[in-house]
Amino acid sequence: MMTTRSCAEWCVERCQNAGQYARTALQAQLIAKRIELLSETVRKAQIVTLLVNPTNRYTDTETEILYGGARSLNLQLHVVRATSVAEFDAAFKEIKDLRTEALLVSADLFLHSQREKLVSLANSYALPTIYPWREYVTAGGLMSYGPSLIDASRLIGIYSGKILRGASPAELPVEQNTKVEFVINLKTAKAQGLAFSIPLLGRADEVIE
Protein backbone atom coordinates (compact mmCIF):
# COMPACT_ATOMS: atom_id res chain seq x y z
CA MET A 1 0.00 0.00 0.00
CA MET A 2 1.29 3.47 -0.87
CA THR A 3 1.97 5.90 1.94
CA THR A 4 0.74 9.48 1.58
CA ARG A 5 4.30 10.60 0.93
CA SER A 6 5.03 7.99 -1.75
CA CYS A 7 1.65 8.70 -3.34
CA ALA A 8 2.45 12.40 -3.65
CA GLU A 9 5.90 11.63 -5.03
CA TRP A 10 4.40 9.28 -7.59
CA CYS A 11 1.81 11.85 -8.64
CA VAL A 12 4.42 14.54 -9.16
CA GLU A 13 6.57 12.14 -11.16
CA ARG A 14 3.65 11.01 -13.27
CA CYS A 15 2.45 14.53 -14.00
CA GLN A 16 5.97 15.60 -14.95
CA ASN A 17 6.94 12.47 -16.90
CA ALA A 18 3.73 11.25 -18.50
CA GLY A 19 5.79 10.38 -21.53
CA GLN A 20 9.03 11.86 -22.76
CA TYR A 21 7.62 12.52 -26.21
CA ALA A 22 4.53 14.33 -24.89
CA ARG A 23 6.55 16.35 -22.42
CA THR A 24 9.19 17.32 -24.96
CA ALA A 25 6.52 18.32 -27.48
CA LEU A 26 4.76 20.55 -24.94
CA GLN A 27 8.08 21.92 -23.72
CA ALA A 28 9.12 22.76 -27.27
CA GLN A 29 5.88 24.68 -27.85
CA LEU A 30 6.22 26.65 -24.62
CA ILE A 31 9.88 27.53 -25.11
CA ALA A 32 9.37 28.52 -28.73
CA LYS A 33 6.47 30.74 -27.72
CA ARG A 34 8.45 32.38 -24.90
CA ILE A 35 11.30 33.46 -27.13
CA GLU A 36 8.81 34.59 -29.78
CA LEU A 37 6.96 36.77 -27.24
CA LEU A 38 10.23 38.17 -25.94
CA SER A 39 11.34 39.01 -29.47
CA GLU A 40 8.01 40.74 -30.15
CA THR A 41 8.35 42.78 -26.97
CA VAL A 42 11.99 43.79 -27.42
CA ARG A 43 12.11 44.10 -31.18
CA LYS A 44 15.64 45.47 -31.39
CA ALA A 45 17.13 42.72 -29.25
CA GLN A 46 19.80 40.61 -30.90
CA ILE A 47 21.41 39.00 -27.86
CA VAL A 48 19.30 36.91 -25.49
CA THR A 49 20.31 34.79 -22.53
CA LEU A 50 18.73 31.77 -20.87
CA LEU A 51 19.21 31.40 -17.11
CA VAL A 52 19.16 27.74 -16.07
CA ASN A 53 19.72 25.46 -13.12
CA PRO A 54 22.13 22.88 -14.61
CA THR A 55 21.12 20.24 -12.05
CA ASN A 56 17.65 20.07 -13.63
CA ARG A 57 17.56 16.98 -15.83
CA TYR A 58 15.57 18.79 -18.54
CA THR A 59 18.03 21.66 -18.91
CA ASP A 60 19.83 20.17 -21.91
CA THR A 61 16.54 19.55 -23.73
CA GLU A 62 15.31 23.07 -23.01
CA THR A 63 18.59 24.59 -24.14
CA GLU A 64 18.64 22.60 -27.37
CA ILE A 65 15.09 23.65 -28.21
CA LEU A 66 15.83 27.27 -27.43
CA TYR A 67 18.93 27.34 -29.61
CA GLY A 68 16.72 26.30 -32.52
CA GLY A 69 14.17 28.99 -31.70
CA ALA A 70 16.86 31.64 -31.42
CA ARG A 71 18.32 30.70 -34.80
CA SER A 72 14.90 30.96 -36.44
CA LEU A 73 14.57 34.52 -35.11
CA ASN A 74 18.16 35.49 -35.97
CA LEU A 75 19.01 35.89 -32.29
CA GLN A 76 22.29 35.13 -30.57
CA LEU A 77 21.70 32.94 -27.51
CA HIS A 78 23.86 32.55 -24.41
CA VAL A 79 23.27 30.21 -21.48
CA VAL A 80 24.13 31.22 -17.90
CA ARG A 81 23.97 28.73 -15.03
CA ALA A 82 23.13 29.06 -11.34
CA THR A 83 22.65 26.25 -8.85
CA SER A 84 22.28 28.28 -5.65
CA VAL A 85 21.18 31.69 -4.41
CA ALA A 86 24.84 32.47 -3.70
CA GLU A 87 25.51 32.27 -7.45
CA PHE A 88 22.76 34.67 -8.52
CA ASP A 89 24.75 37.91 -8.30
CA ALA A 90 27.62 36.46 -10.32
CA ALA A 91 25.17 35.01 -12.83
CA PHE A 92 23.55 38.39 -13.45
CA LYS A 93 26.95 40.05 -13.73
CA GLU A 94 27.80 37.49 -16.42
CA ILE A 95 24.46 38.17 -18.11
CA LYS A 96 25.29 41.88 -18.17
CA ASP A 97 28.84 41.26 -19.41
CA LEU A 98 27.39 39.24 -22.31
CA ARG A 99 25.52 42.41 -23.36
CA THR A 100 22.23 40.62 -22.94
CA GLU A 101 19.26 42.59 -24.25
CA ALA A 102 16.53 40.19 -23.13
CA LEU A 103 16.42 37.27 -20.69
CA LEU A 104 14.54 34.01 -20.34
CA VAL A 105 14.33 32.18 -17.02
CA SER A 106 14.14 28.40 -17.21
CA ALA A 107 11.14 26.43 -15.93
CA ASP A 108 12.82 25.08 -12.81
CA LEU A 109 11.34 24.65 -9.34
CA PHE A 110 14.47 25.82 -7.51
CA LEU A 111 14.58 29.02 -9.56
CA HIS A 112 10.85 29.41 -9.02
CA SER A 113 11.33 29.15 -5.25
CA GLN A 114 13.68 32.14 -5.49
CA ARG A 115 11.49 34.16 -7.86
CA GLU A 116 11.44 37.34 -5.77
CA LYS A 117 15.25 37.48 -5.75
CA LEU A 118 15.45 36.77 -9.49
CA VAL A 119 12.79 39.35 -10.34
CA SER A 120 14.56 41.94 -8.20
CA LEU A 121 17.87 41.30 -9.96
CA ALA A 122 16.35 41.37 -13.44
CA ASN A 123 14.54 44.62 -12.67
CA SER A 124 17.63 46.20 -11.11
CA TYR A 125 19.40 45.66 -14.44
CA ALA A 126 16.29 46.90 -16.33
CA LEU A 127 16.47 43.60 -18.18
CA PRO A 128 13.34 42.59 -20.14
CA THR A 129 12.63 39.07 -18.93
CA ILE A 130 10.09 36.38 -19.67
CA TYR A 131 9.40 33.82 -16.98
CA PRO A 132 7.75 30.38 -17.11
CA TRP A 133 4.96 31.01 -14.57
CA ARG A 134 2.63 33.86 -13.58
CA GLU A 135 3.87 33.90 -9.96
CA TYR A 136 7.00 35.67 -11.21
CA VAL A 137 4.86 38.43 -12.71
CA THR A 138 2.80 38.94 -9.58
CA ALA A 139 6.17 39.33 -7.82
CA GLY A 140 7.02 42.18 -10.21
CA GLY A 141 8.40 40.34 -13.24
CA LEU A 142 7.76 41.69 -16.73
CA MET A 143 5.85 38.81 -18.28
CA SER A 144 5.33 35.06 -18.22
CA TYR A 145 4.12 32.32 -20.51
CA GLY A 146 3.47 28.86 -19.20
CA PRO A 147 1.11 26.36 -17.60
CA SER A 148 -0.92 27.15 -14.52
CA LEU A 149 0.76 25.80 -11.38
CA ILE A 150 -2.62 25.94 -9.65
CA ASP A 151 -4.05 23.57 -12.25
CA ALA A 152 -0.98 21.34 -11.93
CA SER A 153 -1.54 21.13 -8.17
CA ARG A 154 -5.19 20.29 -8.80
CA LEU A 155 -4.19 17.39 -11.06
CA ILE A 156 -1.79 16.09 -8.42
CA GLY A 157 -4.60 16.29 -5.86
CA ILE A 158 -6.93 14.33 -8.15
CA TYR A 159 -4.32 11.60 -8.68
CA SER A 160 -3.58 11.44 -4.95
CA GLY A 161 -7.25 11.13 -4.08
CA LYS A 162 -7.84 8.30 -6.56
CA ILE A 163 -4.82 6.35 -5.34
CA LEU A 164 -5.69 6.80 -1.68
CA ARG A 165 -9.17 5.46 -2.51
CA GLY A 166 -7.55 2.29 -3.86
CA ALA A 167 -7.01 2.97 -7.57
CA SER A 168 -4.01 1.29 -9.19
CA PRO A 169 -1.41 3.86 -10.35
CA ALA A 170 -0.68 1.79 -13.46
CA GLU A 171 -4.33 1.97 -14.53
CA LEU A 172 -4.82 5.71 -14.10
CA PRO A 173 -4.98 7.67 -17.37
CA VAL A 174 -2.33 10.30 -17.96
CA GLU A 175 -3.69 13.86 -17.83
CA GLN A 176 -1.81 16.85 -19.19
CA ASN A 177 -2.03 20.33 -17.71
CA THR A 178 -3.18 22.11 -20.86
CA LYS A 179 -4.02 25.57 -19.50
CA VAL A 180 -1.33 28.03 -20.59
CA GLU A 181 -1.28 31.64 -19.37
CA PHE A 182 0.32 34.74 -20.88
CA VAL A 183 0.62 37.38 -18.15
CA ILE A 184 1.97 40.94 -18.49
CA ASN A 185 2.98 43.47 -15.83
CA LEU A 186 2.48 47.00 -17.19
CA LYS A 187 4.04 48.68 -14.16
CA THR A 188 7.30 46.82 -14.75
CA ALA A 189 7.15 47.53 -18.47
CA LYS A 190 6.80 51.25 -17.80
CA ALA A 191 9.72 51.19 -15.35
CA GLN A 192 11.87 49.54 -18.04
CA GLY A 193 10.76 51.93 -20.77
CA LEU A 194 8.91 49.24 -22.70
CA ALA A 195 5.58 49.50 -24.46
CA PHE A 196 3.58 46.41 -25.39
CA SER A 197 1.83 46.57 -28.74
CA ILE A 198 -1.97 46.55 -28.76
CA PRO A 199 -2.09 43.12 -30.47
CA LEU A 200 0.28 41.68 -27.85
CA LEU A 201 -1.79 43.11 -25.01
CA GLY A 202 -4.87 41.63 -26.63
CA ARG A 203 -3.33 38.16 -26.50
CA ALA A 204 -2.58 38.38 -22.77
CA ASP A 205 -4.70 36.30 -20.41
CA GLU A 206 -4.00 38.76 -17.60
CA VAL A 207 -2.60 42.28 -17.50
CA ILE A 208 -1.33 43.54 -14.15
CA GLU A 209 -1.43 47.32 -13.88
Model-derived features with residue positions:
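Short hydrophobic alpha-helices and adjacent helix-cap/hinge residues
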Residues: 1-209
